[in-house]
Every structure is written in structure tokens, then in C-alpha cells.
Amino acid sequence: MKSQPRPRSLFRIIFGRTTFVILGLLLQIAFFFSIFRWLGNYIHFVYAVYVLISASIVIAILNRPMDSSFKMAWIIPVLVIPVFGVILYVFVQIQFQTRALAKRVSQSIEKTKPYLIQDENVHRQLRLASVRSSRLVDYMNHIAGFPVYENTAAKFFPLGEDMFEQLMKELKAAKHFIFMEYFIIDRGYMWDSILEILRQKAAEGVEVRVMYDGMCCLMLLPYHYPQKLEKMGIRCQMFSPIKPVLSTHQNYRDHRKITVIDGHTAFTGGVNLADEYINRKERFGHWKDTAIMVKGDAVKSFTMMFLQMWDAASSKSKNEEDYGRYLVPVDYKLPEGYTGDGFVMPYADSPLDHEQVGEQVYLDILNQVKSYVHIITPYLILDDGMKNAMAYAAKRGIDVKIIMPHIPDKKYAYLLARTYYPELIASGVKIYEYEPGFTHAKIFVSDDEKAAVGSINLDFRSLYLHFECGTYLYRNCAVADVENDFEKTLKKCIPVTLSDCAHYNWFGTKAGKFLRLIAPLM
């Protein structure tokens, strides 16, 4: 039985936190505009200063080490929107809260480094299997700080409901600790079922921690929901709660989806903890999502990812934790029925270190592909590097296929995505739309050897502005399952042609092209 959306009372809508956040932002915007009007009395002087500052900022933007799409997105408002564009840019560049968050994230990562040391024997085995793939591991070791592992089994789930069933079993079997970190938690069948298990486990003495992104406090959960969980014995934190303050600090969201159980089992993928992700509630037709479970040595990285973000989410002073007690035992053996073949490398991406780790994984797959690369993504808002890599792969004869939603969750993102269709199709990329509904999966699979499954979308927010995570697989048996699911999903899709693109709604096409100019800032 599908769950129904919870009705919101008029009182909660009017006096809820969302309303106060919006009012606070509007008041601050009104204050800035009143300053602009006052400056209008000195228009000639202000205009001369504005032209000088604008020119200086444009030169600075052009010389900054950033993607050209971001440069264009900033130059347009600086030149086109008088005064406000300049103030917006300066405002974004001097954000003390963001610097404080970056410092906490950096410190928490440093604390976990001793637990994420690459086993050179494993690295040597991968180098013997594939020198090219070992180069990606070199990058991960030196830049991102995540090792590659053997002795790890991976199980791929083609739907959220499949993942949910397995997750419930694993949670019930927990003996020592449960860590859960999600972008979205919403009350309903899925979360209520999980919460009941967490409550029971906490009562049994199992350490339970839950962390979710602060966006939830706007529409989905009460602001003081963490206190409710604390009363159940569940430690809980919100990452970066939304506040009625103009700040780019609030732009960096925790988009990750991670569960770690007893240090030996972990889940990640696209599935959040809400009913639409398991098709208990219909929003945009059938919800196609994917997830992956890993068991074994590689879970160590997911454990450290969670602890890194848990520490960074709190600005309060905290005692030093013994992270070692959360690691998988050295003598851990995979359960019967699980095979630890190939190589598994979990990884995380932070928007605060100027390294697009998630994008580099995708680009590495595209640049090394020999036969095919198949992609499922909910969004297609690409920077030049990603777009060119896809086009170049197709032009050299690689089978590049992308599955997109046919029923989008965000109309503006859909209009934006369709502006990329013609140039990609013209270069040889094949694009399909999932006719039954919405694809929320984020997968790359290539050459029957490699796959990446995680939380990372093909858009600027995921690649540049969100905290993300994923799992890279090389010659692991789960790679075949990812490709098989892609082929099954493809049978439910509509191919998109250049003729289709030419007949899209005129207004929608023009709107998409306009939005593309500022897509990196959205």
C-alpha cells in the first residue's frame, strides 16, 4: 500500500520555520535594496566606481582557476546587473562561516588519515591487473585520501525497495554500532520502520548515530527532531541547519547516503530514507533508484567518512574518539555466499577542497573506456570537461549511452538537460528517457570491468557544491549486475533523436538556454 503525504496545518505553514527563514531572507534583501536607493543620490560617482570595480572583478574571475562555465556564470551578473552583481560576488568570496566549516572538515579528515593507509600489496595487485586503473588509485591516495581494497564483497540493488529489504535485515543483525548519514529523512513507512529498529537497538546497548542534512528542517522534519531521537537513545545531528541569514555557507549540503553497521557492512547509492525512494509513495511515476552494499575491508572508508562528517557537523569542542574501535576486525571473514573478488574503492568528495573527486572518477572512466560506457543520472547539467569527454568518447567509436528521466522532479533541471541533448547526440552519444517515470540512480559502468555507484549526480551542485560519496568497482562481480540492470532499464526507455530535439517546446528550449548561462550558480 502506498503511503499518502502528511497534511500540513495552516498554523504550521504560516508559523513554521520555513516561513521565518524566507521572511528573514526577504528582510535582508530589502535592506540591501534600500542602501542601493540611497546611493542613487550620488549616481555619477557611484557609476564610475562601479565600472572600475566591475572591470577589476571580471579580470580577477578570468584569472581564477575555475571551470569556464563558472566564470561565465559570474561575469554575466557582474556586468549585467548594476551594483548588485558586484556585491553578490564580493559577498560570496568573504564567507567566514564557510571558512570555519572548511577548517572543521579539514581537521576531521586529518584525524582519520592514520586509519586510511593504502595496503601496498593490494595496490601492487591492482597495478599488475591494470596500470591505468592504478593511476586513479594513486590520485585517490594522494589527493582524496582513500585506499583501494580487496577482500570486499559488493551487492548491487537495482531498486530502492530491494535495498530497503536488505538494509532492514542488516540493521536487525547489528551488535555494536549503527551509523546513518542521509541527505533526506522523511517520516513515513520507510523511515518509521527503520526508526523502530534503531530504537530497539539503542535499548539493547548498540551505539546508534543518525545525521541528516539541515534542508530537512525546512519542510520534512521539525527543527528539534534530533532531541526527539536523543530521548530514544539515538545520537543525532543536523548538518548545517538552514537559518534566516544570507550566506553561501548554506549552499554546501551533505548529499551523501551512508549506512555503516558494525564496521563490516555499508550501504550507499541514490536512495534516501523516504517513501518515494522505495515506491511506497508515487511522485513522478515509477522511481528508479540504485544502491550498493559492501561487506569487508572497504567498509573502513565508509566508517571514516561518517566520522569525518559527524565531527565536522559539530562546532562544539569534543573529546578525542578512538576511531580504531569502529573498524572491521583484522580477522573478519566474509559471510557464506559473499565473494570478495576484484577491487573496491569507496570515496568521498568535499566542495571545500577545490578537488572535484567525484567528477575525476567519472572522467577517468570516460577517458579510459575501450568499448562502452553506460550512464544513468537524474540530471544532465555538464561543465566543459565532462561534456567534451563524453563527446570525444563517442567520436572515437565508443558506445556511450545515457538514461535520463522522462518525468522530471525539477522542471528547470529538465529544461537545462535538454539543451545538452542536440550537441551530445550530434557527436554520437545516445540518449534515452525512462518512460515509466523518474531515474534517481547515479551509475557509470564500463567495459564489463568498471562501475561507479553512489550519490553523485551529473550536475554542478553534485560535482562542485555538495558533500558526496561513491563506490568504484574494478573487476568485481557486482559490475556485471550494474550492466545487466542498465540493459533491463534501457528496454523501458524512449530513444531521443535530433528530430525530437528540434520539436521541443519553443519557450522551454529558450528558457533552458537562458538558465544554462547561470546553471553553475543555481
Model-derived segments and their meaning:
Residues 385-387, 414-416, 446:
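Histidine/acidic-residue-rich catalytic or RNA/ligand-binding cores of hydrolases
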Residues 376-377, 404, 434, 453-454:
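Thr-Gly-centered strand-to-loop micro-motif
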Residues 1-360, 364, 368, 392, ...:
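N-terminal localization/anchoring segments of enzymes in phospholipid and broader phosphate metabolism
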Residues 369, 379-400, 405, 410:
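Helical hairpin unit composed of two closely spaced alpha helices linked by a short loop
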